């Protein structure tokens, strides 16, 4: 774990092969990855971005704090993914981007979404935070839209304490994204190590039971935080070598993890 020189390059290569996407740029979080993509595509204040009405609140908060015009589109009741019919109704020539969220591991109907978006001159960004491994018509999520972003944060299929990634087959966008990330501050491995130790302690069954109420109260406070302005500078941090080392280990074990998740889902 500590012999982590060149691990960033190795993890990017492995994840690129896994997603079957030419370019991968690692970031400090999934939110940071989306921030980088929006900047790389050159979206300006006031530009319209379409998102599903049911999705991670952090994405909405980021878009509003970057001063984009957010337009909500209904979701399908079967999958909670973007409704094709409502997208057709809501999209306009003012729409610059459509964020397609693969909710709960269910891939969106990406061919239809892309056709509609491109007909109106809009780009399609996949939110693949909850959907590593899933495929749509033989292709992995994260390689279906114009670009995509992943999260490696708490509760995700791959957890590197925090972290995220941009994936794209567009060389120009990849270059811009890498230039943006290169100017970010370097996080220290010490903070990552401390969080890793705390994770192991908290996830002990007895300790988690004692701390459960406090953890739930902290999660509920997130709704109040939505009223606050997001500190965009907090997104401008680099993914560390230590996180890359953790990511490599987790990616190698992902099939095993997914088998356990599938087995556990049978209890629901």
Question: Where do the protein language model's features map onto the residues?
Answer:
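Short amphipathic alpha-helical/adjacent loop interface patches that line ligand
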Residues: 12, 53, 84, 265
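Phosphate-binding glycine-rich loop
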Residues: 5-48, 57-66, 72-74, 139
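Glycine-rich phosphate-binding segment of PLP-dependent enzymes
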Residues: 1-3
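A short beta-strand submotif of the Rossmann-like class I SAM-dependent methyltransferase core
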Residues: 26, 51, 100
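Hydrophobic residues in well-ordered beta-strands that form the structural core
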Residues: 51, 72, 124-126
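Alpha-helical structural signal in soluble globular domains
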Residues: 14, 62, 66, 90, ...
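Active-site region of PLP-dependent enzymes
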Residues: 132-137, 147-267
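Active-site phosphate-binding strand-loop segment of PLP-dependent enzymes
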Residues: 78-160, 165-176, 183
């Amino acid at each position: 774990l500590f012999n982590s020189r060149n691990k960033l390059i190795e993890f990017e290569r492995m994840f690129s092969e896994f997603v079957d996407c030419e370019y991968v740029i690692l970031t400090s979080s999934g939110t940071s990855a989306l921030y980088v993509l929006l900047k790389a595509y050159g979206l300006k204040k006031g530009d319209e971005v379409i998102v599903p009405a049911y999705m991670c609140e952090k994405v909405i908060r980021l878009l509003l704090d970057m001063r984009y015009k957010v337009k909500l589109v209904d979701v399908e009741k079967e999958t909670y993914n973007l409704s094709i019919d409502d997208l057709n109704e809501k999209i306009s020539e003012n729409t610059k981007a459509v964020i397609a969220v693969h909710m709960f591991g269910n891939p969106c109907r990406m061919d239809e979404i892309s056709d509609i978006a491109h007909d109106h001159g809009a780009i399609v960004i996949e939110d693949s935070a909850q959907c590593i491994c899933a495929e749509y018509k033989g292709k992995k999520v994260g390689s279906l839209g114009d670009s995509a972003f992943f999260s490696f944060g708490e509760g995700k299929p791959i957890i590197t304490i925090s972290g995220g990634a941009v994936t794209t087959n567009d060389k120009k966008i990849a270059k811009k994204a890498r230039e943006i990330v290169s100017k970010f501050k370097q996080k220290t491995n010490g903070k990552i190590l401390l969080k890793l130790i705390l994770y192991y302690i908290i996830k002990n069954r007895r300790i988690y039971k004692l701390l459960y109420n406090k953890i739930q109260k902290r999660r509920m406070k997130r709704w109040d935080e939505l009223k606050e302005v997001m500190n965009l500078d907090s997104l401008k941090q680099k993914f560390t070598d230590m996180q890359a080392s953790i990511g490599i280990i987790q990616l190698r074990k992902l099939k095993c993890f997914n088998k356990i998740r599938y087995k556990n889902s049978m209890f629901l």
